[in-house]
Amino acid sequence: MANIKSQIKRIRTNERRRLRNQSVKSSLRTAIRGFREAVDAGDKDKASELLHATSRKLDKAASKGVIHPNQAANKKSALALALNKL
């Protein structure tokens, strides 16, 4: 355990951020999985709705610093490509 007051605070904030990042990444994986299942089922309408929702989640995660903006862009591009192949 740290002795310095600022480091004790940093440990607390790091833990809060770690939990937030973990939660956001988990919800991203769930959203992407749902989209891929809709694409595999061939349901274009549902996949289109899920693409919009998933893209929004990716953008929000990138703006909050949970994932890198380029990673969000790459994932959105791959998902859009999968939808367009239907």
Curated annotation (Swiss-Prot):
Top-level taxon of origin: Bacteria
One Pfam family this sequence matches: Ribosomal_S20p
One cellular component term from this protein's GO annotations in UniProt: cytosol
Gene Ontology molecular function: any one: small ribosomal subunit rRNA binding
Keyword vocabulary terms for this entry: Ribonucleoprotein, Ribosomal protein, RNA-binding, rRNA-binding
Single Gene Ontology BP annotation: translation
InterPro entries in UniProt: Ribosomal_bS20, Ribosomal_bS20_sf
Disulfide bonds: none
Keyword RNA-binding: yes
Family: Belongs to the bacterial ribosomal protein bS20 family.
Function (record text): Binds directly to 16S ribosomal RNA.
Protein name per the record: Small ribosomal subunit protein bS20
Organism: Mycolicibacterium smegmatis (strain ATCC 700084 / mc(2)155)
Gene: rpsT
